[in-house]
Curated annotation (Swiss-Prot):
It is found in: Cytoplasm. Gene3D superfamilies: DnaJ domain, Heat shock protein DnaJ, cysteine-rich domain, Urease metallochaperone UreE, N-terminal domain. GO terms for biological process: chaperone cofactor-dependent protein refolding; DNA replication; protein refolding; response to heat. This is Chaperone protein DnaJ. Zn(2+) 2 binds at residues 163, 166, 185, 188. CDD domains: DnaJ, DnaJ_C, DnaJ_zf. Zn(2+) 1 binds at residues 146, 149, 199, 202. PANTHER family: CHAPERONE PROTEIN DNAJ, DNAJ HOMOLOG 1, MITOCHONDRIAL-RELATED. The keyword Repeat applies. CXXCXGXG motif repeats lie at residues 146-153, 163-170, 185-192, 199-206. It comes from the Bacteria.
Amino acid sequence: MKRDLYETLGVQKSADEKELKSAFRKLAMKYHPDRNPGDNEAEKSFKEINEAYETLKDPQKRAAYDRYGHAAFEQGGMGNGFAGGGAHGFSDIFEDIFGEMMGGRQRRSSGGRERGADLRYNMEISLEEAYSGKTAQIRVPTSITCDVCTGTGAKPGTSPKTCGTCQGTGRVRAAQGFFSIERTCPTCGGRGQTITDPCTKCHGQGRVVEERTLSVNIPAGIEDGTRIRLSGEGEAGLRGGPAGDLYIFLSVKPHEFYQRDGADLYCAVPISMTTATLGGKFDVTTLDGTKSRVTVPEGTQAGKQFRLKGKGMPVLRSSQMGDLYIQIQIETPQKLTKRQRELLQEFEQISSKENNPESAGFFSRMKGFFDTLSE
């Protein structure tokens, strides 16, 4: 009895496309023949993994498998009636009837070449790295063109042959009652070619799974959520087809002191009550490592902002710079000594409305408001 395809990949039946691809890559790296030379069981597992993924990654084939199981792909179960002869399975009919109606024909170029899949890589950087920019080295597990057969899938010294069933088109026509429907060629699988002597390294696929090290240029001023495209650095195409692209999705880690809004930075700085009252100065270290002095005038209130022009983030692909805003927070003294408490009580006694005009005016206005309501 054939093994369940979901069990083969080690995923749940509800697994999405991302989970399927992740499981496939992990298992393909583990059981690849290059990593297990002479191990027949590993080679068998590798083939089963490939077959399971090829079926489940295709929404139409997956729907057929979920409904009918392996019977959906057994050959010869639906009779003959397709131009060119040869047995065919339910999967072909399912694909033709529904795939053609819904525009589901797989795009192929001449010779069965297929474009490789696009890949996604998530990268996290610090705010300092986003400020200065950097060149990062990343390791990406992906399918690359087989260096033995150069992507043809055929053993060196041999070549793929034009499929005799479809004459190289990859499609054959089928009679379905009163209709004539075109379907994928059952002999070559739509490639238009057949390989009688496959490459021993890639087993006729034209590509192998390996890890590659790539350099990624992160420009100064890049923002959280930016996507960088590396053209042609995705999965290698099948049978010599063009490679897909690699997309780097960047996220900038939260900073301990700075918050970012576009090219501007904000920093909340706590100061003492006496500094806010009497005035003072302090230094802040900016992202470029330099220090900038902030002068606090006497009588500064909580929430006051001071602007340091040009001390924010670089504007992407520009010579302009954002600004840095210092937001004042006033820290109230805690755990006072007896002498400190006496001094503050004395200060309270000699204070006047002129010293605290906002609070004095507020309570006066509030009292007047409620007195008016009670009249």
